[in-house]
């Protein structure tokens, strides 16, 4: 009986140790995963039945509506499971992110690695904030309205931050600055590919933006930043 109780306690401890903590501000939802590994999963989104997945959402831009998956259809070169994959050149991307065991780095696109060199995952996107300073916002972009999402570093921790409602891009950047993030990299959002999910402290799957019944026709979903227990 004691062994059974011990096993149950260890299982509960594991669930509580590896879960997503949520903070909120007036305008933002902030998700802090506790994880042992991050990867860029390509081709097929992780399923909620995969118990070792904590959080996953769309990451890099996708180029064309194709009937089959190709790494070349992902914006710029990217690293999946420790292997560098060639993507198409994307002028909109101004930054990048890489992660390896116990370390990560946000950077300008010019500094993005040409080889994996020990990094487990990486991708390029629009750099929003670097070293606490917001990057210049283009005139066309600042008034665009959407529910926005970004991969951020706050007080030495990685987090996913999302606007609570539809806002202008300029306002979203201001909210990130007010929250005092050190770095922020844009994550692809839009109707059909804003679907994401995570596991809470009870191990329950929480869905962010329900998956549309038309999901199989959304060819713009090709890659997901994925946090693992």
For each predicted feature, which ranges?
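Sec-dependent N-terminal signal peptides
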Residues: 4-15
